[in-house]
């Protein structure tokens, strides 16, 4: 007598496909964090009251916030490029790399550079927001600075996702190069 066989199941995806899907998930998450951070920061305006005068402030009025916006734009550009490359790889299902080992080297260095840029952008925004909020306390700019904190926090989360991707690319590089 033979034992009944289990119904046939689809084979699990290859390990390289699982890592690409994980990378895609983290890149989409990074994109979402950066996009929301960008929207919050570009639409952030406030009014500071000094005596009888009112001054309208925007994020572009402060150099640290400008740097943060540039870091977000750079991060978004890189993330969109990497999402496109990852989708191309997944659709072709062609092993561990799309265009030779150069793609892994690009991932390795790109993830490192972009994660540092995002980290410094978040740090600049946190530092500027803390300093400005302290200096301008009681002048009516709390809502403006709280949005600055929110935007910097989302940028920091984008950095964390990119840093995790940087670790993944560090592990993938010695295997393929």
Swiss-Prot record:
Q: Provide Extracellular-side residue ranges.
A: 42-66, 129-153
Among InterPro entries, the record links this protein to: CASP_dom
Keyword terms, alphabetized: Cell membrane, Membrane, Transmembrane, Transmembrane helix
User: What are its GO cellular component terms?
Assistant: plasma membrane
The portions of this protein that span the membrane are 21-41, 67-87, 108-128, 154-174
Location(s) in or outside the cell: Cell membrane
Main location (coarse class) = membrane
Q: What is its membrane topology?
A: Multi-pass membrane protein
Indicate whether Transmembrane helix appears among the record's keywords.
Answer: yes
* Topological domain ranges for the Cytoplasmic compartment: 1-20, 88-107, 175-177
Q: Name one Pfam family in it.
A: CASP_dom
Q: Does the keyword Transmembrane helix apply?
A: yes
Q: Which PANTHER family does the UniProt entry name for this protein?
A: CASP-LIKE PROTEIN 4A4, CASP-LIKE PROTEIN 4D2
Q: State whether it acts alone or in a complex, and with which partners, per the record.
A: Homodimer and heterodimers.
The record's similarity note reads: Belongs to the Casparian strip membrane proteins (CASP) family.
> What's the name of the protein?
CASP-like protein 4D1
Species the sequence originates in: Populus trichocarpa
